[in-house]
């Protein structure tokens, strides 16, 4: 599934939110990426798609929690070429419960803090009902890919998808 949604709020007016989800994608991850506005001028002499990328703030929700701030910085050397670098904030807790352990533990203890309230569920279904009834044809994609090519076209005007690169906690790089 890939779609663009807008939040009906003065604070988020005109800001697109791109959502992508699927089965058997290249990587299992849950991330929120906030792309900042690109500078009004080209800062470095390099060319290519990475040269035009804006800075961003990435929140990795799973498989581990982490935050990364990405900025284009000058690559070491005489050439005035930029590199995208991420500064990571990790909160490694060796005895931390997995999300399912915590959820089940809270359910058994009667703690409803991690569970969605009824009014929030109804609001979510009000949005999803429209998606389900006004759906587009299903687009097939190759297992192990990032999804159908049509999903890429949805965000081309805003610079394309930022695919999850690696697990920020362990540093395991995705291929």
Language-model features and meaning:
Residues 1-175:
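Secretory/organelle targeting and membrane-embedding segments
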